[in-house]
Amino acid sequence: MMGMIIIVPIGEVPGDVLAFLQNSLSGFYAKYGIEVRLVGGLSLSKFQHAFDFERRQFLARYFLPVLSYIRKDFNAKAALGVVNVDIYELGLNFIFGLAHPGLRVAIISLYRLYPEFYGNPPDRKLLKERALKEAMHELGHVFGLEHCPNPKCVMHFSNSIIDTDIKSWMYCEKCLRKLEKNLTRSYV
């Protein structure tokens, strides 16, 4: 294997979703010689300073430097944090995820991916599909991809859960070519 992506759960994150992410991401990245490993989680209490009591949300950017330290400890190509709490960025009501290509880290939140959040019945399969799309999207950013105008491409920007459900979990041909170029070059 040429490298490794680590998945870092932060707080209470469902094990079945983490296992699905690890298996699915492994299946995709194995052809590039990249192993995907689930590592020991972090306590959410480490991030109390990121919590906005009025909004009842965590400011996503505060997770990224900590993930960067963990990524370096594992000598990994990238680190993906997974939380089960609501996250936001300044100027936005909420976000599904956030990436920092310079630090080679990203975070995704499951909070708004649950069908129950929208008043629909629980659907574990749908939750896992949404989580995979967000993981592929944020890792795409980590590896140098921008947002894509193709609504079916996983790199398409999701303004709402409807956008997430419309897109596939895979990169379009154009984004995939760019990703492959980046993975075999500067990000190795």
From Swiss-Prot:
Residues the entry annotates as binding Zn(2+) 1: 137, 141, 147
Active-site residue list: 138
Reported cofactor(s): Zn(2+)
Gene Ontology biological-process entries: proteolysis
Entry annotated with the keyword Protease: yes
Pfam families tied to this protein: Peptidase_M54
Keywords: Hydrolase, Metal-binding, Metalloprotease, Protease, Zinc
Bound cofactor: record note: Binds 2 Zn(2+) ions per subunit. One is catalytic, whereas the other seems to have a structural role.
GO molecular function, one term: zinc ion binding
Entry annotated with the keyword Amino-acid biosynthesis: no
EC number: 3.4.-.-
Disulfide bonds: none
Residues reported in the UniProt entry to bind Zn(2+) 2: 148, 153, 172, 175
Signal peptide: none
Assembly: Monomer.
Protein family membership: Belongs to the peptidase M54 family.
Function: Probable zinc metalloprotease whose natural substrate is unknown.
HAMAP family: Archaemetzincin (MF_01842)
Protein name stated in the entry: Archaemetzincin
Organism expressing this protein natively: Pyrococcus abyssi (strain GE5 / Orsay)
Highest classification ranks of the organism: Archaea, Methanobacteriati, Methanobacteriota, Thermococci, Thermococcales
Name of the gene this protein is made from: amzA
